[in-house]
Design a protein with these regions (language model features):
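Hydrophobic anchor at the start of a short beta-strand
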Residues: 2
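Soluble metallo-hydrolase cores and metallopeptidase-like ectodomains found primarily
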Residues: 73, 87, 295-297
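Conserved beta-strand-loop-beta-strand element in the redox core of flavoprotein oxidoreductases
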Residues: 83-104
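Conserved N-terminal/central alpha/beta ligand/cofactor-binding core
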Residues: 5-83, 136-138
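Short low-complexity, flexible loop/linker segments enriched in glycine and/or proline
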Residues: 17-21, 88-89, 142-144
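Fold-independent oxyanion-binding glycine-rich loops
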Residues: 7-8, 77, 92-97, 113-114, ...
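Flavin (FAD/FMN)-binding glycine-rich loop and adjacent Rossmann-like elements that form
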Residues: 14, 101-109, 113-315
């Protein structure tokens, strides 16, 4: 039996309708061409980034999970405490974010899928975090137009922006590069980073509606702003193998290689053109892709990357 514990009301994390990072679907390639097919059952159907609420199919994901007899699903449950005995996790405590009622989950094996290494950190697992030059958090957004004029309130609390201070949101989409918080604390200051991103989005739309973009956007209106940020770099739990750039580029054939990854080494930095207004806290990024990765084949990730090197029953 598996207890799937999720602190949001929907499944999918960054791939849910709350954040809307689409699944590119580069599967059926490399050494393990079939294993990625498991995600096709519940992957989004987005045609653009960010896609629509309907394209991310939150309800479909939940139906699929609840149909599995061996999964007990606990939505809206936030894990906050871990019990450890002799380097083994014995229990995880989670509280219902709606009622504050706490539940103690015991088990044999535990998987930390928090994205922040939270369970590992609470259990005393070895981990690392890049001190400087980290990637940030994105809050994507979308806007629309109609035949009648739409008003938009002035936003004195937002960032003070003009049209030249941000990339124009083409095709009515503010994409992944609306990213902030590069060297901020991705865990302790997550809400502060999210709020700064909000101020950037609303400052940009204020420029479109009430400042130098007003003549061309009289009929524009916001359709969606991600109120949950999509984080990137955070804690990295140590396994028995640390996969290196050299391993990835050379397609090193580990004896315990078990899954393929087909994305290139993709580093994000503040985009200089748009960092001038707020150099200490930029909000627009650029992506620099490593050219050495063969994305038609990918690279095998060894099993030894997927478990903690010092907590015996933690994945």
């Amino acid at each position: 039996k598996v207890a799937l514990i999720q602190n949001r009301a929907v499944l999918g994390g960054n791939g849910s309708s709350e954040v809307r990072v689409w699944a590119k679907g580069n599967i059926r390639r490399g050494k393990y061409p079939r294993i990625g097919e498991i995600i096709e059952e519940f992957a989004d159907k987005a045609k653009k980034s960010p896609g629509t609420y309907e394209e991310f199919g939150d309800a479909k994901k939940e139906v699929i999970v609840r149909a599995e007899d061996n999964i007990d699903l606990y939505l809206n449950h936030h894990a906050h405490k871990v019990e450890v005995t002799d380097k083994r996790i014995t229990a995880v405590h989670a509280f219902d974010v709606r009622t504050s009622a706490s539940t103690r989950f015991t088990g044999t094996l535990f998987a930390d899928c928090t994205g922040h290494g939270t369970i590992g950190h609470l259990a005393g697992a070895d981990y690392d975090m890049t001190p400087k030059g980290r990637m940030g958090m994105s809050n994507m957004w979308a806007w629309g137009e109609e035949e009648k004029t739409r008003s938009f309130p002035k936003t004195p609390w937002a960032l003070d922006l003009e049209m030249k201070d941000f990339p124009y949101p083409r095709a009515h989409h503010g994409q992944w590069f609306w990213e902030g918080g590069f060297d901020k604390d991705a865990i302790g200051d997550a809400e502060g980073i999210r709020d700064w991103n909000f101020r950037a989005v609303f400052g940009a739309f204020n420029a479109m509606k009430n400042r130098d973009g007003a003549d061309k956007h009289r009929n524009a209106f916001l359709t969606w702003v991600a109120y949950v940020g999509g984080p990137r770099e955070s804690r990295r739990l140590y396994g028995d193998v640390v996969l290196t750039e050299k391993d990835i580029v050379s397609k090193r054939d580990f004896p315990d290689g078990c899954v393929p990854s087909t994305w290139s080494i993709d580093l994000h930095y503040p985009k200089e053109q748009y960092a001038k207004k707020y150099p200490d806290n930029p909000f627009i990024s650029k992506a620099v892709h490593g050219r050495g990765v063969d994305r038609s084949y990918g690279y095998p990730v060894p099993y030894r990357c997927f478990y903690s090197r010092n907590i015996e029953n933690l994945f």
